[in-house]
Amino acid sequence: AQQFWDLIIFRIGVGVGEAALGPIALVVLSAYFTREKLPLALGIWGAGPFLGSALAGWGGAAMITNMDAIKPYLGFLSEFSDWRLTFFLFAIPGLIFALLLKFLPFPQIALEKKEKVEFMPFFKKAWKFFLLMFVGVTITGLVGYSVLAWGIEMLVRVHDIPKTIAGQNFGIFNIFLGIGGSIGAGIIASKMIERGIINAHLRIAGIFVILIWVSLLLFTLSTSSFYSQVGLAGMIFFMSCGPGLYGAAFQNASPINLRGRTAAIYYISANVVGFALGPFALGF
């Protein structure tokens, strides 16, 4: 990319790949795991972005700092600027894992004719569930992604915390609380479903959504930098619990042959609306 618009176009291309991953991953994981184990599986999978963002931040900073020592081993790639090389090197593991997926066996699911359900008749019966989930996930995403995008700046501008300290604390919150919340919520939901509480993921998600708003008020209204960071940490923790629970709810409520479509509905509400409009609306 040589110009701003080149970079935007290529970033959109990356986004297309990211958008395709979510629904496909939900369908694949729901085929591998039972209803009882699915929340935990999706919780572990949902912890990936928190781990990745933390590693990218810390690893990227370390890589750029030591780039002069790395470049002699990169051959012709050493002619590129440091930030481009950082992107290249971090992309290599992703390409390797993508190739390894080719050899991952997919469970064979035989659908009886009577088990196949048309989308519109099913949606007419379950539209209330999907509407409420769509609205809830969208609103939560608008708030959550806005805080993730602007949380550091708020700590810097409102509480005069040095940007390096604010960024470091934000990374620590993500890697420990983000991963812990995502996996922990999955463990709790799976245990509850095993005990016969089939809507456990929705119950837990409902409680955590309330706690997100409590944390949001503490983060935004507190005059103390300490309590504001406590609120931010709470938001990250309770937000991280959602994706695995929401995904499991959509998959468990859908017929097997419609899971891809319902997963797409979930990601439209969570990502397209929440991720695209949330930070933009707050910045505007």
Question: For each predicted feature, which ranges?
Answer:
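Paired small-residue
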Residues: 5-13, 227-234
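Cytoplasmic helix-loop-helix junction between adjacent transmembrane helices
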Residues: 10-48
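Helix-loop-helix hairpin linking two adjacent transmembrane segments in secondary transporters
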Residues: 45-102
